[in-house]
Regions:
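Conserved SAM-binding loop of SAM-dependent methyltransferases across substrates and taxa
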Residues: 49-61
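Conserved class I S-adenosyl-L-methionine
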Residues: 1-40
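Conserved SAM-binding strand-loop segment of SAM-dependent methyltransferases
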Residues: 82-94
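A short acidic, Gly/Pro-enriched loop at the edge of an enzyme's catalytic core
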Residues: 97-104
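A short glycine-rich, Lys/Arg-flanked "PGG" loop and its adjoining helix->strand segment in the class I
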Residues: 122-134
Length: 248
């Protein structure tokens, strides 16, 4: 369990994003290495509260953080004081950054699997192509196959836990089940405050089925050149990822 100061006065969207995503670090060395090779400016797609943006910007690279959530970006701006960071509130499938070109575009974690299938990915690739500099790199992480489970038939993973100003936040994955075009992850979110008051709510997230070969083919159809993919290993807490590399 880690203690931290309250982000954005306990805005629930910010807190749960930090609890469920903020501790993941296995991919950071790759993003850092790519920034070293390609330089800035860097576009971070699905930036959230800045897990990747802050890591890259702290090494001196200009980063534009794009996310559709104003609340998450507000928290990011607070944390980015003194760093070369700009935020843009927009949907990754429908954004325009006039006059901007990026040598590196990053799409970390499973962001690309939230685009809503082939049409959503095609829309994103069109937007990305419009802002990627000639010879630049678009690096897209997709999760390796998720194993289905439920809490009745097997032991679920350990919860993600964080304490903020005496309030304990816990997010526990309780099932992953398959649908025709994706996988649905069900979590139970619980809080316990300093008086012992407890809240419980359910959260569902749907990830599109997507494999590297499919994404590479979609990238080629959108006019990108396909480079060798990179692997991010799994950990005890997180599945591994494959990072598809597309060049402008």
């Amino acid at each position: 369990m880690s203690a931290a100061r309250a982000p954005r006065a306990h805005v629930p969207e910010v807190v749960w994003h930090d609890v469920e995503c903020g501790a993941y670090a296995e991919d950071l060395p790759l993003w850092r290495d790519l920034a070293t090779i390609h330089g800035g400016p860097v576009l971070d797609v699905g930036a959230g509260t800045g897990r990747v943006t802050l890591h890259v910007a702290a090494r001196g690279y200009e980063v534009v953080a794009l996310d559709r959530s104003p609340a998450l970006l507000a928290a990011l701006r607070e944390r980015a004081t003194g760093l070369p960071v700009q935020t843009v509130a927009a949907d990754a499938r429908d954004f325009d950054l006039p006059g901007r070109r990026f040598g590196l575009i990053l799409v970390p974690m499973q962001t690309a699997q939230l685009f809503g299938g082939p049409e959503g990915r095609a829309a994103f690739l069109r937007c990305a192509a419009a802002v990627l500099a000639p010879g630049g790199l678009l690096a897209i992480a997709i999760a390796d196959a998720l194993e289905t489970f439920d809490e009745v038939r097997c032991m679920p993973p350990m919860p993600d836990i964080r304490e903020i100003d005496g309030i304990v936040y816990a997010s526990r994955p309780v099932s992953v089940h398959e649908e025709p075009d994706g996988a649905v992850i069900r979590r139970i979110r619980e809080t316990v405050d300093t008086t012992g008051h407890r809240t419980v709510e359910e959260d569902l997230i749907r990830l599109d089925h997507l494999d590297p070969a499919t994404l590479e083919a979609e990238g080629a159809a959108a006019g990108f050149r396909v480079d060798r993919a990179r692997a991010i290993p799994e950990t005890d807490e997180y599945v591994g990822s494959t990072v598809v590399m597309l060049r402008g």
